[in-house]
Amino acid sequence: MAHRWLILALVAAAAPRALASPGPSLNERQSDDEPFSPPYYPAPNGGWVSTWAEAYEKAHSIVSNLTLAEKVNLTTGTGIFMGPCAGQTGSVPRLGIPNLCLHDSPLGVRNTDHNTAFPPGITVGATFDKSLMYERGVGLGEEARGKGVNVLLGPSVGPLGRKPRGGRNWEGFGFDPVLQGIGGAETIKGMQSTGLIACIKHFVGNEQEMHRMSSVVTQGYSSNIDDRTLHELYIWPFAEGVRAEVGSVMIAYNDVNKSSCSQNSKLINGVLKDELGFQGFVVTDWLAHYGGVSSALAGLDMDMPGDGAVPLFGNSYWGPELSRSILNGTVPVERLNDMVTRILATWYKMGQDQDYPLPNFSSNTEDEKGLLYPGAVISPIGVVNQYVNVQGNHNITARAIARDAITLLKNEGDLLPLRRNDSLKVFGTDAGPDPQGLNSCADKGCNRGVLTMGWGSGTSKLPYLITPQEAIANITPTAEFFITDSFPSSVDANDEDIAIVFINSDSGENYITVDGNPGDRKTSGLHAWHNGDELVKAAAERFSQVVVVIHTVGPIILEEWIDLDSVKAVLIAHLPGQEAGYSLTDVLFGDYSPSGHLPYTIPYQESNYPSSVGLLQQPFGQIQDYYTEGLYIDYRHFLKEDITPRYAFGHGLSYTTFEFSEPALSVVTPLDSAYPPSRPAKGPTPTYPNTIPPASEAAWPAKFNRIWRYIYPYLNNPQADAAVANSSKTYPYPDGYSTDPQPPPRAGGAEGGNPALWDVAFSVQVTVTNTGQHSGRAVAQLYVELPDSLGLDTPSRQLRQFEKTKVLETGQSETLTLEVTRKDVSVWDVEVQDWKTVVGGEGVKIHIGESVLDIRTECEVGGRCVTL
């Protein structure tokens, strides 16, 4: 999401052409060189999943009594800066339905006070700890609920990390669909356990910040993705989120296969709502609404923040235009009823009808009193900030995540952990505070002091910050600090001194440019910012023992100094949030052994990546971003091309050592067929009269006090609009548009897809023993290798599961059980449009280790298990 209100949105994207097949695959082509997203109409109704039945029944009762204006009011935002939240819908006061508050961010409540700034997703992913993923979700839910937020805009599982320089990779959990999927699902479960509605984003193909948005000058880029790649990589984590019963899905700005995501009927109607069985509501990213009728027919349910192509004028593609489209018969009444039913069913399912708080903060001002509608020329004034403290004890969870994510890349001579009486000299501005003050940059749009998070809408204010400088000083008062990015000439270096050098690499969202980087790491590349490499080299020249601490949004090139003799230890502390200092000293001084693992690959050089994942730029015309690398991103590419990385995906050392032994595999649900059993039939969905409502339902109420710019559902002359329905005028519907229901997709049947896909095919056990001299935790990472008999080019190893041990003392063991589902050992069959596996699992190999290249045990289905 972005609040850059000067961005202009393109009015509409080209309509797709019709195909004869009732179930075409994504990116079928009209010609050899033109991507194509086939039509999929009509929008499937929600309510057929049994676990949502009660919520849909309640919603049906309400929707049956709503007027046209009230229905439209719940689908349309009130306008940018027209309320306390990033966006809010209209309300239905007579039935007790409030404006629904939608607000950022995935790591904490944005632009407010007395909140927790949790570590971002990339840090959470590095823990490889499902319990911490869930606990953070609970914390996010409790805080957002406490502030009166109905929908928190997170978690983010798109971008997936296809482009290493991508600006918002740090908001997600790692560069792998399973790591993203598990991280997203656990976060959703935690968030929604509190009654908050989670909003998984960005669906889909938002892998680059530059040129993602459409304007009156140019159209946002098109991510051109083949059907198999889209299913096996980019949709995978969204399927896990839908299976976790996520309440809402945010649509991305960009096109996919030359059709805008917000009106891409194949993606929303066909994949998300029909194949994945999504029961909640679909919302735009902010100002990502490019057409009114087209998006409604394509399955969009809510428009945020409500404005049309030119914001701040009170115009909308929906609002009164949606009322008009219903009255003149362009948009079927059934479609509007389903939109509103989905929104209210989600509200009921989370229990938000029961004493749920109203917003008690304003994202527009820090003052207690302020404008209620800051975007209006004349606005009433009232209390907008009540300064409700929602932090609770969430600092404990935040510190645990930041600590358990710390990834030890190198530790020669066991220099770490440090002793409290070591002679330490600390270098780098990344160790210290922002000299201009805490939260001095809006949305973290600067890189000063320790890097706690990237920049953009996916941030929150820091309630406090203990920097590494402060934390180290509290433990070793004799440490000397040089908070500068130029190595001081006056530093004395003794043999017993240990230099700790702090460096970082930042990125963020495209509406802010920092040091020449417009969101994506365009200028900096994958290198340290602020002279970081030179600072390390200078310290390595003067000191015989150097520890490097890196705060980074993603992969970073280390080659200028990583092999220098004096660089003994390297830690990646990722993005630690508010607990940057003590989470680091917990590990540096040995109170905890590092247990984080890389959620991405660190290459020797950027040229190790395929050329297709570089940033794309052009001043005019639509950028066509072809995903020609297919399934081969990050570690999958390195394995395929036999490129040894500097540090592999999943790599992470400890202060101790672990042995993996006694692997065992058992068959749980036999894979008796190549394809899953037949999907369950759809249950009934709510039904309503489909007659066009009276025009009077969209008329302005008498003596209504309008607020200029506020988006209302009312029409000045609704009778004239209603008369059009009986005229000879017809709307130019997209090619392929139909109101005839589609046959149920064979890969569907429940939330996430055919429930048989999650049948446990194999259970794998492995015993992990601490064989070192320090307590610690190990991560067992399970990778699947599929046989050539499937007849498809498939990555040689794919992460499919992971488990983390408890803290193991020296000599202590724990047996871990990792489950492998049917889907885990399947590929997407483009022709059949279903998931295909090897009958009996014959030839499937299961690898377990501490990274993708550090495999400790191997099992072959139908064969034996061995320890390597």
From Swiss-Prot:
It catalyses: Hydrolysis of terminal, non-reducing beta-D-glucosyl residues with release of beta-D-glucose. The keyword Transmembrane does not apply. SUPFAM superfamilies: (Trans)glycosidases (SSF51445), Beta-D-glucan exohydrolase, C-terminal domain (SSF52279). Keywords: Carbohydrate metabolism, Cellulose degradation, Glycoprotein, Glycosidase, Hydrolase, Polysaccharide degradation, Secreted, Signal. Pathway: Glycan metabolism; cellulose degradation. One of its GO terms (cellular component) is extracellular region. Residues 21-40, 731-752 are annotated as: Disordered. Its main location: secreted. Belongs to the glycosyl hydrolase 3 family. This is Probable beta-glucosidase F. It comes from Emericella nidulans (strain FGSC A4 / ATCC 38163 / CBS 112.46 / NRRL 194 / M139) (Aspergillus nidulans). The gene is bglF.
